[in-house]
A protein has these predicted regions:
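Interdomain hinge and pocket-entrance segments immediately C-terminal to HTH DNA-binding domains
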Residues: 84-88
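Alpha-helical residues within the helix-turn-helix
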Residues: 23-24, 41, 62
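A short LG(V/I)-centered, amphipathic sequence patch enriched
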Residues: 40-57
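Helix-turn-helix DNA-binding elements, focusing on the entry/boundary residues of the two helices
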Residues: 17-18, 36, 50
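A short, exposed helix-loop element centered on a Lys and neighboring polar residues
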Residues: 76-83
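Short helix-boundary/capping micro-motifs
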Residues: 12-26
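The N-cap/first-turn positions of alpha helices
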Residues: 2-8, 29, 61, 68
Length: 88
């Protein structure tokens, strides 16, 4: 149900590498780049500082990562509660 772009961002942030994130998510590296660019466009900010093959979260990226974890927690709680209702 959640926005896959957030999963892509989270994976890139944790792996520190677009190619490794692509491999883990079973998508292409250009697809990873596209998802990150879409989020950057929507938020109107850079999420990563790129220096060749090295990437580092910007301050905005660090903030998004913090909220991404909270969002995933909310999604998990939502799915749990919905499943509880279905089992009644």
């Amino acid at each position: 149900m959640f926005d896959f772009r957030l999963k892509v961002f989270d994976t890139v942030a944790k792996r520190g590498n677009f190619t490794k994130a692509a491999s883990e998510l079973n998508i292409t590296q250009p697809a990873v780049s596209k998802h990150i660019k879409e989020i950057e466009r929507l938020l109107n900010t850079k999420l990563f500082d790129r220096n060749g093959t090295k990437i580092k979260l910007t301050v905005s990226g660090e903030i998004l990562l913090k909220y991404t974890q909270k969002i995933f927690g909310v999604y998990s709680a939502l799915e749990f509660e919905i499943n509880q209702i279905k089992q009644q």
